[in-house]
Amino acid sequence: MVLKSYRETLNDGFLQYGYKKTERSEEGKRIGEKFHEEGKLAYKVMSLRDSDYKMVGVLTTGLDVKVKTLYPPSFRKINKNKLKVLMDGIEYDVIKADHDSNKQYLFFYLQQAVKSRE
């Protein structure tokens, strides 16, 4: 009898997820954006396959990283595609978020955010 693992080890690090909020001056002018963290998740970096590029709809460039995390119950009610992810000090946009058949794991397809010139 073969024992199935209870959970997969997600030990590549922790990612921070959240939203970008616009900061405004007292006059109401936009002065920039700041990342507001909603939480942290342990992740494992996954390899990208051709089917991942087709599913996301990005054929040549744009898909930088695919990560696997546990599926928190709080994620069932939010739009995961509008999230921003901060990993190792690098900000990423979530292109697509997909779950497995058991809704135990969540896969984030990430594109590195473009830095604005300051």
Identify what each model region corresponds to.
Residues 1-33:
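Active-site-proximal polar cores
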Residues 2, 30-118:
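Short, conserved turn/kink motifs that form compact alpha/beta structural patches or helix kinks used as
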